[in-house]
């Protein structure tokens, strides 16, 4: 596997990694870096710009956009797998590919419908009129639900100032510098149904495998002669985002596990994920995929066993953990997805919204509960005094919750908003999960800007 670091010598790697870390660490002068921030800053090394020759005639562009783009050279043209987030990034990737980017582009394959993988197709297609290939479910995929206009951007840190943003978990930036509007998307001209489809494109034999998981339509691309597997977003160098903060349904874990079983059986020698660095060496690929499957399955099995015992979501979050050997695995660090989020998502998906406590069938409204608690504790001033004490002692969650009692009754109470914003800021700074960090910090920013 050959690496070309943005067209420069290998020694540029260290310089680039350092620059990326310093760029993201603009906040360092304001406070001492937390352990979580140090972890996320180190994770930035996984996004450095480079063109990697995975196998003969197979190149992947890492770090030039939110998602990877793979170039497969054929006998009379090229096949592109995923197309980056937008035309701006796509043009930069074509330039980085340089002479390796052969024309015409005979086909473009989408692994799934997410904008960061499908937004630059028009640039790669140019005037070549390639076949655009995907699973049929990509065509019928519904837009993400979300909870409002800000939701996706909040988890990705889209509106955070530079001195607070580090990364978005699977990418160095999402929509901060270049758009994620799918403006360069081209609809499929050819789809397949069922479990798989064998193709020969520009003389390259390949098999498209329907591997639902991160998305229902996720398609793995298997190159049997080169022993190269492109997994889409079913495998990443982070615990998977099974139950996203940004307002999406919990992913179908049983299908995800089955899809990983399917691709493990291929015995690939090279593995290209949808984001970050490829993995090479048959033993390394098998170990990485197996650990990924086992990590997901462990959380699933533990959660389902707990549900069967009548445990509540809060109880499950306290008890369900990755086994020690998996918790240390580099492909299961919680930069993007979270074990705790996954546990709550599985519970809601499999057992519904009700936690089994009869008191929670028809609970008081937040405002009603807060009004009674404030009366019981002597009013808003006493509650805020207690919240300030919690904040100063580092009991950040309790500080934020007490501020919420006041805000439930008086949403624009300036002191309560400040206490909550300060608590959320510190909570965010301590996170090594990028989506949690970004959401905390964005919520704090919103409280400060909208008193």
Q: Which residue ranges define each predicted feature?
A:
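Active-site metal-binding motif and surrounding structural segment of the metallo-beta-lactamase
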Residues: 46, 51, 75-77, 87-134, ...
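Gram-negative bacterial Sec-dependent N-terminal signal peptides
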Residues: 1-28
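Metallo-beta-lactamase
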Residues: 38, 53, 77-78, 85-87, 140-309
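Accessory terminal helices/loops
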Residues: 19, 29-41, 265-270, 278-451
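Divalent metal-coordination and catalytic microenvironments
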Residues: 57, 72, 82, 97, ...
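Conserved beta-strand hairpin/beta-sheet module of binuclear metal-dependent hydrolase folds
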Residues: 48-99, 220-223, 227-233
